[in-house]
Curated annotation (Swiss-Prot):
Keyword field: Aminoacyl-tRNA synthetase, ATP-binding, Cytoplasm, Ligase, Nucleotide-binding, Protein biosynthesis
CDD domains linked to this entry: TrpRS_core
Motif 'HIGH' region boundaries: 9-17
Assembly and binders: Homodimer.
Signal peptide: none
The gene coding this protein: trpS
Taxonomic path: Bacteria, Pseudomonadati, Aquificota, Aquificia, Aquificales
InterPro entries documented for this protein: aa-tRNA-synth_I_CS (IPR001412), aa-tRNA-synth_Ic (IPR002305), Rossmann-like_a/b/a_fold (IPR014729), Trp-tRNA-ligase (IPR002306), Trp-tRNA-ligase_bac-type (IPR024109), Trp-tRNA_synthetase (IPR050203)
Protein name: Tryptophan--tRNA ligase
Predominant location: cytoplasm
Purpose: Catalyzes the attachment of tryptophan to tRNA(Trp).
Motif 'KMSKS' region positions after renumbering to this chain: 261-265
Entry EC no(s): 6.1.1.2
Reactions catalysed, as given in the entry: tRNA(Trp) + L-tryptophan + ATP = L-tryptophyl-tRNA(Trp) + AMP + diphosphate + H(+)
Length: 395
């Protein structure tokens, strides 16, 4: 089976990337023909104004991929933007893809919903505030506000001042904070690139006639759209593309140090580039069961991020079982539990860290490997595009 998948270059990789994606890719490359690409064009859908670090981020992904076990001898590891045919097929797919299909994309729907919700909240807030201020203005003695224009002017100025002070100063920032986005980014993300990125994903997969795409459940709508586009193209111009299947694999969830989803933007991630001292700081500050304040307090391992990590890094199943039992019984304190975890986490991280150091010294050589793989990928992509142009009667 031909497997195709990609990853946006947002910087150095962390434990969440490994358990969510890379570990599965490493297994797949042993059994299938795999194409894994650094999706630098996709990075621009939400970060088109901040390209200063893009090239360095691409290098970091290259290093981490190889350090974590992806092998350019077993997989085609390449950079999306070096294969220009992705963009050509994206353009042609865009001609046949109804806009309504894209507007059903859950990610886009969420953006539009949040935009509308924020606008509605602002409108509702302003109207209620104006009503309240109007009541206050009406309480002012008539001889001070006998001029209607003065009354209106006073009402307008007070309303605007209160909106700036309350909504724009306190309420709106809190909403945007919960959405994890700045106000400018929030509005400027509503672009053609953001609307159309699922079509680019379809082109990424189908340019290699990908048959399988390893994804999580949240990506299923995108794979279904790729299948719809393939079907529509085949119906219009003749059978060129397979209908790719989603390869749903069970991946362990590794929470961040604060219990939320592990993310660079949340500041709760452990990176493969972190030195031992930095990892220790992060682990010792990890959130635990809030009800377990003292060592002899009974704990609830099922809600504790530290125990979730034990299940991944502490390989001795009997020890994991004992940690769970001792935590529940109040025989194991959180500090000691973290120190046990740290020992096993370091056994996992140190070999990867060492490989990373060696790879960093050979970055020019590694870049050339990715460039050469990109040339291999492009040869295949060019053959696909020859078939596409012929089917569409393009020169």
């Amino acid at each position: 089976m031909r497997i195709v998948s990609g990853m946006r270059p947002t910087g150095k990789l962390h434990l969440g990337h490994y358990f969510g994606v890379i570990r599965n890719w490493v297994k797949l490359q042993e059994e299938h023909e795999c194409f894994f690409f650094i999706a630098d064009w996709h990075a621009l859908t939400t970060a088109y104004k901040n390209t200063k670090e893009l090239r360095q981020n691409i290098r970091e992904v290259m290093i981490d991929w190889l350090a974590l076990g992806l092998d350019p001898q077993k997989s085609v590891l390449f950079i999306q933007s070096l294969v220009k045919e992705h963009a050509e097929l994206f353009l042609l797919f865009g001609m046949i893809t109804p806009k309504s299909w894209l507007e059903l994309n859950p990610t886009y729907k969420d953006l539009k919903y949040n935009l509308l919700r924020l606008t509605d909240l602002e409108k509702e807030f302003k109207e209620k505030l104006k009503e309240r201020i109007s009541e206050i203005v009406n309480l002012i003695p008539f001889n001070i506000t006998k001029e209607e224009k003065f009354r209106e002017h006073l009402l307008e100025n007070l309303t605007q001042t209160m909106i700036e002070a309350l909504f724009e100063g306190e309420i709106e920032p809190e909403i945007l904070k919960r959405l994890n986005v700045s106000k400018r980014d929030f509005y400027e993300t509503d672009t053609f690139g953001f609307l159309g990125y699922p079509v680019l994903q379809a082109a990424d997969i189908l340019i290699y006639k990908g048959e399988g795409v390893p994804v999580g459940e949240d990506q299923l709508p995108h794979i279904e759209l790729s299948r719809e586009i393939a079907r529509r193209f085949n119906r219009l111009y003749g059978k060129i593309f397979p209908e790719p299947k989603a390869l749903l694999t069970e991946t362990p969830k590794i929470p961040g140090t604060d219990g939320r989803k592990m993310s660079k933007s949340y500041g709760n991630a452990v990176f493969f580039s972190d030195e031992k001292e930095e990892v220790e700081k992060k682990v010792m500050k990890m959130f635990t069961d809030p009800q377990k304040i003292r060592k002899n307090d009974p704990g609830r391992p099922e809600i504790c991020p530290v125990f979730s990590w034990h299940k991944l890094f502490t390989k001795d199943e009997e020890l994991v079982k004992k940690i769970e039992e001792d935590c529940r019984a109040g025989r194991l304190g959180c500090v000691e539990c973290k120190r046990i975890l740290l020992k096993h986490l370091e056994e996992f991280l140190e070999p990867i860290r060492e490989r990373r150091r060696e790879l960093e010294k050979r970055i020019n050589e590694i870049e050339e490997v990715f460039y050469e793989n990109s040339r291999k990928a492009r040869e295949i992509a060019q053959k696909t595009m020859e078939e596409v142009r012929k089917a569409m009667n393009l020169p």
